[in-house]
């Protein structure tokens, strides 16, 4: 019997990355509230958020293996989520200009009573950015559905001076470690 894998995410980037594994899956969007816990560390928060997404979907599909993830950008004690508007995106990108920040992605996989979570953290350093670069980037519309207001897999890559860690963690799903974890759930393509 083929086991059903569900991706508890509407992120097109997570879908593209999961497609690389060539494991059949379906998508069910989680209705879990994405609220950070004040006294949690960034790592604890990102794992907790991923688990909340998974548990919300697993309640509806108790016989499936459910995979969920959440990504946060963390800089100077602040969480940088998806921007509310162009002004918020400009504020975030100006803050990250010429600086190094952390991107953390938490992953949760649940099968019945078994629930495994992990996170990966990557440091991203930006070049110093000019106001006109930031404005032009915001005008593309790319920042608006991304934590930290940039997509490393798109035009936002032009701002990146270097990364330390897994590139796919920044995109939204550390795919290599995710594949290895799915293997422990007996889900793999090779």
Curated annotation (Swiss-Prot):
Pfam families: Maf (PF02545)
Record's function text: Nucleoside triphosphate pyrophosphatase that hydrolyzes dTTP and UTP. May have a dual role in cell division arrest and in preventing the incorporation of modified nucleotides into cellular nucleic acids.
Family: Belongs to the Maf family. YhdE subfamily.
Active site: 70
Name of this chain's protein: dTTP/UTP pyrophosphatase
Uppermost EC category: hydrolase
InterPro entries linked: ITPase-like_fam, Maf-like
Cofactor: a divalent metal cation
GO cellular component, one term: cytoplasm
Important for substrate specificity, annotated site positions: 13, 71, 153
Reaction(s) this enzyme catalyzes, per UniProt: dTTP + H2O = dTMP + diphosphate + H(+); UTP + H2O = UMP + diphosphate + H(+)
Keywords: Cytoplasm, Hydrolase, Nucleotide metabolism
EC numbers on record: 3.6.1.9
GO terms of molecular function: dTTP diphosphatase activity; UTP diphosphatase activity
GO biological processes: nucleotide metabolic process
Record localization: Cytoplasm
């Amino acid at each position: 019997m083929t086991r059903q894998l569900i991706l508890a995410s509407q992120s097109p980037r997570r879908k593209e990355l999961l497609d690389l594994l060539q494991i059949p899956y379906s998508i069910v969007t989680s209705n879990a509230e994405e609220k950070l816990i004040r006294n949690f560390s960034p790592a604890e928060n990102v794992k907790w958020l991923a688990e909340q997404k998974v548990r919300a979907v697993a309640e509806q599909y108790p016989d499936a293996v459910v995979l969920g993830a959440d990504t946060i950008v963390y800089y100077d004690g602040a969480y940088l989520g998806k921007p509310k508007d162009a002004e918020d995106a400009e504020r975030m990108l100006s803050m990250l200009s010429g600086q190094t920040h952390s991107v953390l992605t938490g992953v949760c996989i649940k099968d019945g009573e078994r629930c495994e979570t992990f996170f990966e953290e990557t440091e991203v350093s930006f070049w110093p950015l000019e106001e006109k670069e930031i404005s032009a980037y915001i005008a593309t519309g790319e920042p608006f559905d991304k934590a930290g207001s940039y997509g490393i897999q798109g035009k936002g890559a032009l701002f990146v001076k270097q990364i330390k860690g897994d590139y796919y963690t920044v995109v939204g799903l550390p795919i290599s470690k995710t594949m290895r974890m799915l293997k422990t759930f007996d889900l793999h393509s090779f």
